Amino acid sequence: MNLRLKRWITAGATLAMVATMGLSACSTNRALSSETGKNEVTMASRTPNWIFPISAKGYTQGENGQFIQSLYRPLFAYKSTSETPYKINLPKSLGQVPDVSEDGKTYTITLRDDAKWSDGTAVSTRDIEFWWNLVTNNKDQWASYKEGFFPDGASLAVLDEHTFSITTEEVFNPSWFIDNQINKVALLPQHAWDKTSADEAVSDLDRTPEGAQAVFAYLQGEAKDLSSYAKNPLWQTVNGPWKLSSFTPDQGLELVPNENYWGEDKPKIDKLIYKAFTGDDAEFNSVRSGAIDFGYIPAASYNQRSAVESKGYNVFLWPGNTITYLALNFAPQAPGSKFINQKYIRQAMQQLIDQPTLSEKIWSNTASPTCGPVPMPADKVGTTDGCVYKFDPDAAKKLLEDHGWKVVPDGSTTCENPGTGDNQCGEGIEAGDALSFKLVSQSGFVSTHQMFEEIISQFGKLGIKIDMNEVPDSVGASQACDDETPCTWDLSFFGSQTSWGFPIYASGERLFATDAPVNLGQYSNPEADKLIEESTRSTEPDALQAYNDFLAEDLPVLWMPNPYYQITAVKNTLDLGELDATGDTWPEDWAWKTDGAK
């Protein structure tokens, strides 16, 4: 599971590859599938578990963003090939390009004046103000919030029904602020949602802190009731091209066109069906039988690509601006944190992960090494150029022995020289302590399981034990620890389809800053915090590079093979419109090709 909401980007060369698959739009009229006689599309997808456009902790799985985006148009969508400033995808956005003041502190944004909610009410800056009031009075409940970052140190001014401004106390890099901060702003239907119960009349409750907290609690509570999604009137007030018609948790959902959608990009199909599967095998069986229109091939089955293509599918690799990593739990409550907090142990562990071989043999070359917190440049993807640590078991063994460990291959490596000296095991580690870790990983992904079988075997050769527990939701099973939350994990993997996808600007304030919202392992380093902050302020390219170089070496996580977001299999009679490497999907642009179309 990918933790990001929905945002990926890669180099233009990848787009060229995608374009060669013949997937750009070639028809704008509705057309029935020649195979089914129906104007609907069935796609493989985990069922989303969140519908409220304000993200919540514990509900950040990747499918949520695409689902919400279909119902609620974003203030800003992005496109990696866009020539619009800040890579904004204007046709899919409710906002126009921000105007930045000369002092760099005020961002003035004008909304489209033709956008409407599905009940006919005009989209306006009141919907922006509503979002602002809910978020600023419930920051501790918002998954995207980190203290000291947006909306802290910023103020909102409503200028008219379609214009607002955000003013910051300090100057930031405009690209970072627009692409990574203002992109979190959502328009919410104040006229339909500003209440605290289903039968209460809408009012301006959000304009007081108490009212905003009560409204937020009501909306968040309703969003947690997944079984009610399709029948709850709240979620029928949308401004996107789609409306929800059915929803069954863990099984799937159906979207139908919003008949009152205001945009020119009205859906060309009559129904979009999200079908959930229990795992890779079940999904791939559906692809092989031709029962699904838009699915994927598991990496372990990539060698069956030709057979899939013979069933009438186009197959292509869908990459992204992503990294994949194994989260490390630095929290004192974690069973193995005393080991993880020793940098030399992290270094030894990284040197036991053979990323090139795992990428080739396990992932069938549908993954490539991750070297640090910033995605690899396009010309280095597939290499370890720039990686601080290469696969080197001998160096890993020497690190352990040089720090007081008795390495017992295929046995149990233990500390025999405790203490805090340069040649000792380190703080908190006692004589006889065995080097072992508890791993939480994702179930249902064949390549992930095979990869960790190999990694566990490799670690075992140096007497390091890893106990693996595979669960459907590894993020939910490895939340940040505290004194009140039982803490049973040391390592957590949720990167079967990459761990994290970045917006246009790949900074790390949400991942690796102290107390960051997605810093599950509670990594904290003052130098990292300093470099992260500098990367958000400076317009110099070396600021982001300096941040990357430090964390690549310091190992807040272990860098892992980074899978393509998806090995996509799509019926060759289904036109997906223009596919962009951001990973965003726009189902309203999809259409079945008419007879004779190519």
For every predicted segment, state its role.
Residues 22-25:
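C-terminal motif of bacterial Sec signal peptides marking the signal peptidase cleavage site
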Residues 44-102, 133, 237:
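N-terminal lobe/hinge region of extracytoplasmic solute-binding protein
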Residues 346-347, 359, 465-482, 505-572, ...:
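Extracytoplasmic/peripheral linker and loop segments enriched in polar/acidic and small residues
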Residues 236, 256, 340-457, 598:
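Append "and occasionally in soluble cytosolic enzymes with long acidic Gly/Pro-rich linkers
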Residues 96-142, 159, 165-167, 175, ...:
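Aromatic- and charge-enriched surface segment that lines or borders ligand/interaction sites
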Residues 135-145, 155-158, 245-260, 273-337, ...:
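Extracellular/periplasmic solute-recognition and catalytic clefts
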Residues 27-29:
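Bacterial signal peptide processing site
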Residues 147-219:
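Surface-exposed binding/hinge segments that line
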